[in-house]
C-alpha cells in the first residue's frame, strides 16, 4: 500500500511539473484582431491564409481586404478575423503586384514568445497626465514585403513589437482561382500586367524601371543599433518629457519620463517618425531611411561596440531643431529629415501659466 501511494505521489508531481512547464496548459486568453499591411507603394493582396494553435486547430483566417499598402510602420487593414488562442502556425498565400508573383509561406510560429509578449504588455501614458496604465496588445499584424518577406508583429496603442520574420516562396496560383471569375482569353501574364498598371502609381513604376525594386531594404530595417535620443538645449531647464517613436522596422513605443531620466541606451531599429515633447515645446520629425542607414552603418563600422546618440539641438526660440548623430568624439549632422513643425511657448511663459493654473485650482 505504501509503495502504491508513493508511486501515485510521484505521478502527480510529474504531471504538475509538466503542466507548469507548458505555458499552453494555462487558460490565459488574449483576444486579438488580425490585420495585414504592406510597404507603401508596393501593394500586396491575400489569396488565402489562416492561423492554427498548438493543437493544429483553426483559430482564424488572415483577412482578405483587397490590395493593402498602408505602410510597414502601421497596423494595416482589419477584416473581421481574430481569436484569443496563441497562434503556433501560419499558412499564407498572397500576390505581390509590383513583382507580378504569388508567394506562399507555411511556418511554425514562436508561440512561447507571443505568449510572453502578451503577458508583458506595455505601459501607456494617460491623456494629459503623467500617470500610466498597464495594457496588452490587441492586434496581430501580418506584413508582406517584396522578395517574400513576411513579418509578424503584436500591435497596441502606440506600441508594436516584432514577433518573427518568415520567408515565403514563389508559388503558382491560377488567376481565375484567385479572382474567382474567368475572363476569357486572358493569360496569366496579362492578368499580372493589368494589375501592375492599375495598382501601382506612375511614380513608383518609373522608380522600378530606373532602379528596380529595393529587395533587402526591409531586412535592413530590421537591423538594430544601440542608441538613445539626446537633447542639447540652450536653456538648462529644458528637457525631454515624452517621446512617441515609430521605427522603420515596424516597431513602436512610448518613452516615458522614468525611462528618459535614466538616459540609457537601447537596442532599436532606425527611427521613422518621432513626436518629441520637451518642457514647453514639442515637434514631430520624420527621418530619412537611406540617410539613417548610411550614418548608423558608418558609425557602427568606425566605432564597433560603442553606443550612439541622436542629438536634437534647438535654435533660439525654437525656430528650428538641428539633428545630428554622435558616437564617441565623432558627430555627423543630418540633412534629409523633415521637421513637421515646432509648437509651444517659452519656458518662462509656461512656468507662469502653470503657476496660475495651480493657484486657480487651489481656489486662490
PLM regions: where:
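Structured interaction patches on ligand/partner-binding surfaces of diverse proteins
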Residues: 99-124, 281-317
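Structural motif
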Residues: 34-45, 230-239
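Sec-dependent signal peptide recognition
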Residues: 2-9
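Bacterial signal peptide processing site
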Residues: 20-22
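Tryptophan-paired
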Residues: 49-96, 239-293
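C-terminal motif of bacterial Sec signal peptides marking the signal peptidase cleavage site
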Residues: 15-18
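Long, low-hydrophobicity ectodomains and other hydrophilic envelope-associated domains
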Residues: 182, 190-275, 279-284
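Compositionally biased low-complexity segments at domain edges in trafficked proteins
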Residues: 117-218, 299-364
Amino acid at each position: 500500500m505504501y509503495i502504491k501511494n508513493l508511486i501515485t505521489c510521484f505521478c502527480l508531481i510529474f504531471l504538475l511539473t509538466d503542466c507548469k512547464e507548458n505555458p499552453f496548459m494555462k487558460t490565459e486568453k488574449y483576444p486579438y484582431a488580425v490585420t495585414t499591411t504592406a510597404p507603401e507603394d508596393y501593394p500586396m493582396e491575400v489569396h488565402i491564409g489562416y492561423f492554427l494553435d498548438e493543437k493544429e486547430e483553426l483559430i482564424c483566417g488572415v483577412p482578405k481586404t483587397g490590395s493593402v499598402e498602408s505602410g510597414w510602420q502601421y497596423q494595416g487593414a482589419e477584416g473581421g478575423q481574430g481569436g484569443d488562442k496563441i497562434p503556433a502556425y501560419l499558412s499564407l498565400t498572397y500576390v505581390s503586384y509590383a513583382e507580378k508573383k504569388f508567394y506562399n509561406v507555411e511556418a511554425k510560429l514562436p508561440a512561447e514568445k507571443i505568449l510572453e509578449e502578451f503577458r508583458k504588455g506595455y505601459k501607456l501614458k494617460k491623456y494629459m497626465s503623467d500617470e500610466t496604465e498597464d495594457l496588452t496588445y490587441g492586434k496581430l499584424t501580418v506584413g508582406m514585403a517584396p522578395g517574400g518577406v513576411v513579418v509578424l508583429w503584436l500591435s497596441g496603442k502606440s506600441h508594436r513589437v516584432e514577433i518573427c520574420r518568415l520567408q515565403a516562396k514563389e508559388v503558382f496560383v491560377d488567376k481565375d482561382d484567385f479572382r474567382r471569375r474567368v475572363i476569357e482569353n486572358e493569360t496569366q501574364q496579362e492578368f499580372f500586367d493589368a494589375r501592375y498598371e492599375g495598382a501601382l502609381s506612375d511614380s513608383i513604376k518609373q522608380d522600378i524601371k530606373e532602379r528596380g525594386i529595393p529587395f533587402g531594404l526591409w531586412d535592413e530595417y530590421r537591423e538594430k543599433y544601440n542608441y538613445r535620443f539626446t537633447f542639447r538645449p540652450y536653456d538648462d531647464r529644458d528637457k525631454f518629457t515624452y517621446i512617441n517613436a515609430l521605427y522603420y522596422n515596424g516597431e513602436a513605443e512610448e518613452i516615458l519620463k522614468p525611462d528618459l531620466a535614466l538616459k540609457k541606451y537601447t537596442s532599436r531599429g532606425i527611427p521613422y517618425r518621432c513626436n518629441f515633447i520637451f518642457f514647453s515645446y514639442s515637434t514631430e520629425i520624420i527621418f530619412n531611411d537611406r540617410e539613417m542607414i548610411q550614418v548608423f552603418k558608418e558609425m557602427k563600422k568606425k566605432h564597433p561596440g560603442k553606443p550612439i546618440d541622436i542629438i536634437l539641438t534647438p535654435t533660439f526660440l525654437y525656430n528650428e531643431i538641428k539633428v545630428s548623430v554622435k558616437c564617441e568624439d565623432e558627430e555627423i549632422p543630418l540633412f534629409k529629415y523633415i521637421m513637421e513643425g515646432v509648437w509651444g511657448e517659452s519656458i518662462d511663459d509656461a512656468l507662469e501659466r502653470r503657476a496660475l493654473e495651480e493657484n486657480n485650482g487651489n481656489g486662490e
